[in-house]
């Protein structure tokens, strides 16, 4: 006996696809997007908040992929690590943090050195300068004998040539602190790779663990180093790992990684702590005391300064509890976002959850391959739809974000048009399955690629993001077109409750978001329906 085919809800997350009415530097408006344009004209749509307090960040803080996917998947406002750590500094508990003090005590008791490694910017996506300044205060109050700072330059979540201003803040702060030295500088392209391009990680690792200088005899002024690369047309993100002073990592040293976002720090930490490590030749360093701000990867077994909160009953877990099947697909750059982050930090799939990882192109920067792997992601998605077994399919298209980060407008426009073509194919497949297609984004980026001064902008934005609901004629919500209306002032936290509403599944109490669908006078759903209970 043939099983009845499932009419899926397909959630397509267009990473970095924000909304702006401005035309200048707006790759999304400039691009030819007939599919998205038609869907916006034909189907119910609204705009959602994807930044600031509505997604668990400080007021005015731009959103990012981790936060966006966590909020979408959680159906609630989750206090993000940026806020949690900032609050601990404000209420002084940071300075009494047991693990931070233990790292300092290790360096003191063994008369070794303490190393601080992390991204040096105020971008607030992976780290924050305030956290580094607070760490220096802890080390000073504990009288750590030697403190070496290894700075990773940004240029991706900040202006592309802003590193000197951030490093100056640190340099000025430690000017009269003789025990503190800025030891190395490395662009995030090398130190924060997350796509298993181990040659990049090796370059950062080698400088951290070697006393050799790549530029000239040490010590070297950070301004001279950065100007050296600026004059070669190399921006902050791509500064090669360089030593400007003494302070390599040696046996018995303590190390604190102060990035709070895990995905781009895993590889470097892995190279330092994993035994055996087979991705490149490493030094035989022993008795290291390694502390990470957050849980980068449970297999690394490092101490944690800020352990994760337990997050239950995200969308994936809820769907699984009802015995329904679900599917996640993304290319390498965003795979963790539709799995780990979307599931609230759960590394293993839930029962009934299938996953597909599509490899991102092996290029140095994505302006060399603006299509990325969007077409293959679409093929895998359509295949999952056609199986007729999945109630919920979650897809990420990485193009708008990854190309937006390059600052290359022409290539970003090309990537936007590629995604639009893919959405056309996806729309056809969902329509044929009588499913429901939801299109949204996790944060803005590609809609703002020029600053007011006309220079390249590579960072995320605080702009609203689209939410489009496209229903098949026999989908669970009656309407097919303009008969569904949305609440105003929604946020990403309302996406999961909306999906559960369409699936006719009861929202768990942990989900504080609300369904975006209102029972307008045109609404033909059964207003007295009883949600399916667990």
Curated annotation (Swiss-Prot):
Gene name as annotated: gpmI
Q: What class of enzyme is it?
A: isomerase
Q: In which residues is substrate bound?
A: 126, 156-157, 188, 194, 261-264, 334
Query: Which cellular compartments is it found in?
Result: Plastid, Chloroplast
- Active-site annotation: 65 (phosphoserine intermediate)
Instruction: Please provide one cellular component term from the Gene Ontology annotations of this protein.
Output: chloroplast
What is the scientific name of the source organism?
Porphyra purpurea
Residues that, per the record, bind Mn(2+) 2: 15, 65, 442-443
GO biological process annotations for this chain's record? Answer: glucose catabolic process; glycolytic process
From the Swiss-Prot or TrEMBL record, give the protein name.
Answer: 2,3-bisphosphoglycerate-independent phosphoglycerate mutase
Cofactor or coenzyme needed: Mn(2+)
